[in-house]
A protein has these predicted regions:
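Non-globular targeting/processing and membrane-anchoring segments
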Residues: 2-129, 143, 153-322
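Short active-site neighborhood of thiol/selenol oxidoreductases, capturing the structured segment around
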Residues: 124-139, 148-150
């Protein structure tokens, strides 16, 4: 499957190779974007500068106001996810996700890529660490969060998740999704560290650490990624596996409400939900390889074939200018 990627702000990270968005599933090119939106999509990743604290505070105020105001599609709206909605997503059985991964037609999903054996392991608090970097405006990040929540919930518990939607002016506009901003995750088996770089309006949210910047500058680029790299979503799984770009086509989610999307993505009755569940199954397998097959209640149901990623050479998504 050709990976789908968004590219953040170039003014906020040391120079990296120019980016190119991969074609979406079935070889469809994204619709043409306005010049202003294209410039925003080409912006880079890190948020630097002495004025960042002031900007972030301003953004937090904006988010707090709009999340309670019921503003229209142009607002940066965060809404707490209800316990019932979260339970519906996280309670999809492991066996269902694993079976979906095994049954997924070729080309519909793209499993994590293996990093070289010499890559330093990524740990935090003496546990394997998974680092996610994305942005709320990014439609491909929006799609990727669904299987991430499904898979990670088998190893731990999310707290204070919010719902949001991707930019209204990007491809796949208003894709409903979770936001990891302001959330936390607890697990005895692994550490999950999410960084939401910008909100759906493209305003800064979280500043990556120097170590996180080094990760994405090193591994979100050739030879580890197809094309010129520099894309989000970016996920480093324990220094062993890599995701750069979404792993399936989530375009059918565009303009759905979050509540509608919860039902749609857990129904296993449409190609999008089946693909997302397959991605979650692959994620569970690779995470089990990081946690030494713990917990056994989860990992004992996962075949060995899902506990390895795909070879880097298999990451052959055709790239095109966007």
């Amino acid at each position: 499957m050709a990976k789908q990627r968004s590219t953040p702000d170039s003014s906020k990270v040391p120079p990296r190779p120019s980016t190119a968005r991969s074609k979406p599933a079935a070889g469809r090119r994204p619709p043409s974007r306005t010049a202003a939106n294209r410039r925003r999509q080409q912006r880079r990743l890190a948020i630097i500068g002495s004025g960042v604290a002031v900007v972030v505070i301003a953004v937090l105020v904006i988010v707090g106001v709009t999340s309670g105001s019921g503003s229209g599609s142009g607002s940066s709206q965060l809404t707490p996810v209800s316990a019932a909605e979260l339970a519906q997503v996280t309670s999809v059985p492991t066996s269902t996700l694993v079976a979906a991964a095994g049954a997924a037609p070729g080309g519909t999903v793209s499993p994590p890529t293996n990093l070289p054996a010499t890559t330093p392991t990524l740990t935090s608090a003496s546990k394997p660490e998974i680092v996610y970097m994305g942005a709320e405006y990014c439609p491909y990040c929006a799609a990727e969060r669904w299987p991430l929540v499904m898979a990670l919930s088998k190893f731990g518990t999310f707290h204070n998740l919010s719902s949001t939607k991707s930019s209204s002016t990007d491809v796949n506009p208003n894709t409903p999704t979770f936001s990891f901003y302001g959330s936390s995750y607890t697990s005895p088996y692994l550490t999950f560290t999410p960084v939401e770089l910008e909100n759906r309006l493209g305003k800064p949210l979280q500043k990556p650490t120097a170590a996180q910047n080094q990760l994405i500058n090193t591994y979100d680029a050739p030879p580890y990624t197809q094309g010129s790299g520099g894309s989000i979503p970016f996920v480093d799984l324990g220094g062993k596996f890599l995701i750069s770009g979404t792993e399936y086509d989530g375009s059918a989610l565009s303009n759905k409400s979050f509540t509608s999307a919860v039902g749609y993505m857990t129904s296993a009755s449409n190609p999008t939900s089946r693909a997302a569940e397959a991605v979650a199954g692959h994620l569970i397998g690779t995470i089990c390889s990081l946690t030494n097959d713990q917990p056994a209640s989860v990992c004992s149901t996962v075949p060995a074939s899902l506990k390895t990623g795909q070879a880097a050479a298999a990451n052959q998504g055709s790239s095109s200018g966007g």
